[in-house]
Amino acid sequence: MASPSQDQIKVLEQSRQRLVQLTRSLGSLIGSLNQSDPLPSWSSLQSQASIISNNLLSVSEHLSDNCDLLSALVAYPGPEYPGRTQASTLEQLLRTKLDPRIEDWVARGRRAGASALEDKDALSETELAELWDWAPVEANQEARRRNWGGDYTLEEREMGIQNVVTGLRRQLEDDERDEDEDEDDEEEEEGEGEDEEMEVVGVRRRSDAGAGLGFDTAVPTPASSQQVQKGAGPVVPLDDVLRFMTTGTLPQQR
C-alpha cells in the first residue's frame, strides 16, 4: 500500500486530537469523583458531562465523515520502530478485534439501530421536527394551567376536594381559611385607608329641610398624626426587646 498523503495524515491527526480531548475529559470526571470528598456539586458534574457529550459528538461526526478512509487504512510497523521495547503499544496498534466489552456495546448499538430502521410506524424527520416545534409551546401552556404550589390540582378543585381520595385535605381547608383571612385583612386595610382620608370632627343637627344629623369632616394633617403618636405608649428600643426575648430581663423604664 502506498504511503498516506498529507490530507490523510491530517485526518489521522484530527482523530488523535479529538480522542485525546475525550480521554482527558473522561479522566477529569473520574478523578473528581474518586478524589473529592464530599462529591462535586451538581453544577460541576453537569458541566463535565456536557463537555464529555460534546467531545463524543465531535468524535462521532469526525469518524462518520471519514469512515471510508479510516476503514481502508492499515497500520504496520516500519523497520525503525522499536518493537522490543514498545511491544505492548505495537500490539494495541495491530489489534484487529475490539475489546470484548466494547464488542458487546457495538453489537447492542447496531441492534438498536437496525430495529429503529425496521420500524415502519416511526416518525419521519419532518414529523420529528414538527413535534419538537410543537412540544415546548404546548408544555408551557400545560404548565401554566397547573397549580404547582397547592395540595390539589386545578382539576381536583373544580371537581370538588371531597371527591379526592388522596391529599392533605386539612391543610387545604387551612389554606382556604388563610385566604379568607387575607381577604378580610385587605378589606379592613381599605376601610382604615378610607377612614384616614376623611376624619369626623363634629356632629350637628341638619339645618336643611331633611331630618337627621350632619357630620363635620376634615382631612387629617401631619400634626394631628403626631399628636396621636404622642398619646401612644413609650417606644421600647430594639436592643431591650432582644434582651427580653433572650434573657427575660425586663426593659428599663424610660
Swiss-Prot record:
Give any GO molecular function from the UniProt entry: transcription coregulator activity
Q: Name one GO cellular component term.
A: mediator complex
**InterPro entries named in the record:** Mediatior_Med8_fun/met
Principal localization reads nucleus
Tagged with keyword Coiled coil: yes
Compositionally biased tracts (Acidic residues)? 173-199
GO terms classed as biological process: regulation of transcription by RNA polymerase II
- The segment annotated Disordered runs over 167-234
| Residue ranges of coiled coil | 154-190
Question: Does the keyword field hold Metal-binding?
Answer: no
One Pfam short name: Med8
- Keyword list, A-Z: Activator, Coiled coil, Nucleus, Transcription, Transcription regulation
Similarity remark: Belongs to the Mediator complex subunit 8 family.
Q: How does it assemble?
A: Component of the Mediator complex.
Q: What does this protein do?
A: Component of the Mediator complex, a coactivator involved in the regulated transcription of nearly all RNA polymerase II-dependent genes. Mediator functions as a bridge to convey information from gene-specific regulatory proteins to the basal RNA polymerase II transcription machinery. Mediator is recruited to promoters by direct interactions with regulatory proteins and serves as a scaffold for the assembly of a functional preinitiation complex with RNA polymerase II and the general transcription factors.
Name of the protein in its database record: Mediator of RNA polymerase II transcription subunit 8
